[in-house]
Amino acid sequence: MGSGAIRRRLALGAAVLAAAGTLALTATGTAQAASGGCAGREVRTLPFKTGVTHVYKRDGYVCAVTVPRTPGPARTMSVSVQARGNRPVVDRGRYNRLAGPVTVHAGHRCVWIKGAVGRDSVSSGWILC
């Protein structure tokens, strides 16, 4: 095999590795965007008229993000997580993509999740007990 053929095969191999790496990074970024920065597995989805609050759990920690149903300009959004016996941890402001993530250590305690986009909201009651 000539040196030209070897160079072509090396170039092809490098291109395949680069493409595979790019796909892996894209998939990771997509998963990160879907979770809004929360670690763990999704355990609840709390839909409401103008958005959805996603709840994740891992190793005793509970995390939540609120995402609007439709993209658009910045608007008032919030997400709140309260472990039973503690004060709620809240992220409230004007965002265009999501509110949160908000993470609390719940251990084996129940949590109360709230989310809002504009005037519409959701409140879970005590869950994950």
For each of these PLM feature ranges, what is it?
Residues M1-A33:
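Secretory targeting and sorting signals
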